[in-house]
């Protein structure tokens, strides 16, 4: 592979002396029908590791360490928009306001076996971000990813917004704390808004002890979804195990487990309930 390190980019001398990077600093940029296999590369000191628009990409076994410099909200590990095809696997990514982000896809995506380590305090950051993802027969697959979020403050492990036909299986999300990065509020392991015809199964969300004492920390939260199956998911030490808002019609919950939650399951919408354990 190729190492991409210590990019300087088009920044002014004053900003350079201050250690700031240009917001467009990108390790690899793909645009318009590009096809690329990106494997075993190293990305350090870049605002975005890989950025792609309307292209095909296989991104495997890369290392990315995205700096926690201002503006944090502009940083990305892998940022994919309107892909022709996407396969993202076995990457190690430190930080990035969005660690892996895919938007505008109808061709089917695979995100699997990635390790994401996060220690950001900027609100609404997400490890894996999915936006406007469509498909057929559950051809979007996100599985076996491991996320560690330290000192979460309104952080999301896996965020879904306007997503259909997704199989979200066997992901592990751990919320941790240290003395300089204590447990915060309003964190979510898995968050879904307008998610439809999807299967969310066997995901494990765990918080260190203080996360269960902080209001609105939640394992799984779903809003305005439809025709989703959520089963065999397990949450531990979160203030809420699972929460459901809006219609969530034809949604089935079964065999989920909520350990050490202030409230295991909170429903503000009709769902079909199977056996749960709290």
Predicted segments, located by residue:
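Extracellular beta-strand/beta-solenoid scaffold signature
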Residues: 1-8, 22-31, 44-54, 67-83, ...
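Short "repeat-start/strand-capping" segments in structured domains, especially the N-termini
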Residues: 12, 33-37, 54-58, 83-87, ...
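Extracellular beta-strand-rich, repetitive "passenger/adhesive" scaffolds
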Residues: 1-21, 37-42, 61-71, 88-92, ...
């Amino acid at each position: 592979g190729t190492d991409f390190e210590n990019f300087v980019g088009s920044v002014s001398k004053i900003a350079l002396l201050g250690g700031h990077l240009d917001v467009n600093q990108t390790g690899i940029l793909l645009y318009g029908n590009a096809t690329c296999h990106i494997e075993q590369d190293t990305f350090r000191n870049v605002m975005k590791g890989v950025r792609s628009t309307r292209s095909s990409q296989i991104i495997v076994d890369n290392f990315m360490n995205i700096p926690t410099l201002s503006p944090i909200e502009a940083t990305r590990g892998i940022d994919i928009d309107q892909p022709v095809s996407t396969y993202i696997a076995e990457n190690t990514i430190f930080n990035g306001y969005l660690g892996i982000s895919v938007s505008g896809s109808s061709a089917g995506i695979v995100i699997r076996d990635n390790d994401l380590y996060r220690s950001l305090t900027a609100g609404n950051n997400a490890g894996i971000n999915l936006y406007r993802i469509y498909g057929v027969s559950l051809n979007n697959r996100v599985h076996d990813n491991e996320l560690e979020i330290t000192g979460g403050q309104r952080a999301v492990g896996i965020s879904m917004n306007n997503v259909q036909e997704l199989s979200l299986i066997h992901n592990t999300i751990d919320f941790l704390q240290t003395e300089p990065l204590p447990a915060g509020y309003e964190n979510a392991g898995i968050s879904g808004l307008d998610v439809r015809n999807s299967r969310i199964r066997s995901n494990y969300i765990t918080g260190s002890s203080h996360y269960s004492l902080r209001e609105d920390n939640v394992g799984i939260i779903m809003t305005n979804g439809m025709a989703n199956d959520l089963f065999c998911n397990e949450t531990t030490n979160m203030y809420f195990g699972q929460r459901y808002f809006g219609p969530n019609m034809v949604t089935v919950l079964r065999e989920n487990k909520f350990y050490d939650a202030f409230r295991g399951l909170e429903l503000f919408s009709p769902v079909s309930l199977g056996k749960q354990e709290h």
